[in-house]
C-alpha cells in the first residue's frame, strides 16, 4: 500500500530511509529485529557481492574440515549453518544500504548503536524490550586492508572510534566484538606472508 502511494506522491516528497511514515518505521524496526537481533543463524555481512561466492566455493571444497560451518546432506546438497546478509531493494529503501560496497556494514553498525536522532539504537531497544541479547552473532567481514582509504580503516576510525588497543586486538585475533553487550563482531581474514 505504502509503496503504491509513494509512487503517486509528488516528486518533491522524499521517500528514503530517513523519511519513512509510521507504518514504514514499524516495518523497519521489524526487519532489524527479524534479521539482525532474533536471527536463527549467525549472519555474515560481506563487502561485495562476489565475496559470498568465494566463501561458498572455499567451504564446499573444505566442508570436511569445517563441519560446524557446512555439511553435506543425504542428497549431496550443501547445508550452511550460517546465512549471508542479502542486499535487496527492501534494505536499500528502509535502511539506505546500497546493493554493493562496504557502506552496508557501516550503516548496520549505526543502526545497532543509534548514531544520531534519525537512526534509532535498535540493539538497546530490543535488549530492553525482550530482556535478552541477540540470538546469534552478526559478523561484519572486512577485507584485511589497513591503508587509510580502505573500508576497514575508515570504519574503525570514523564509526567505531577504535582505540589503539582495539586495533591491536583486531590485528592479533582477526576479530573484535564491536559493542560489549552485543554479538556484533568485525572479522578480517588472515594476511598471507608480508602482504598488507
For each predicted feature, which ranges?
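Acidic, divalent-metal-binding catalytic cores of TOPRIM
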Residues: 1-196
Amino acid at each position: 500500500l505504502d509503496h503504491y502511494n509513494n509512487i503517486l506522491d509528488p516528486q518533491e516528497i522524499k521517500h528514503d530511509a530517513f523519511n519513512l511514515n509510521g507504518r514504514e518505521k514499524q516495518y523497519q524496526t521489524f526487519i532489524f529485529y527479524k534479521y539482525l537481533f532474533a536471527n536463527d543463524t549467525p549472519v555474515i555481512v560481506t563487502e561485495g557481492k562476489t565475496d559470498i561466492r568465494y566463501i561458498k566455493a572455499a567451504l564446499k571444497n573444505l566442508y570436511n574440515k569445517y563441519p560446524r560451518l557446512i555439511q553435506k546432506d543425504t542428497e549431496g546438497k550443501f547445508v550452511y549453518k550460517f546465512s549471508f546478509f542479502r542486499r535487496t531493494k527492501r534494505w536499500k529503501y528502509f535502511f539506505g544500504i546500497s546493493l554493493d560496497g562496504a557502506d552496508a556494514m557501516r550503516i548496520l553498525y549505526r543502526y545497532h548503536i543509534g548514531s544520531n536522532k534519525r537512526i534509532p539504537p535498535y540493539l538497546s531497544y530490543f535488549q530492553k524490550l525482550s530482556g535478552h541479547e541477540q540470538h546469534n552473532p552478526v559478523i561484519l567481514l572486512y577485507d584485511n586492508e589497513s591503508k587509510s582509504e580502505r573500508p576497514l580503516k575508515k570504519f574503525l576510525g570514523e564509526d567505531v572510534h577504535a582505540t589503539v588497543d582495539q586495533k591491536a586486538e583486531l590485528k592479533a585475533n582477526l576479530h573484535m566484538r564491536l559493542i560489549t553487550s552485543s554479538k556484533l563482531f568485525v572479522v578480517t581474514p588472515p594476511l598471507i606472508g608480508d602482504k598488507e
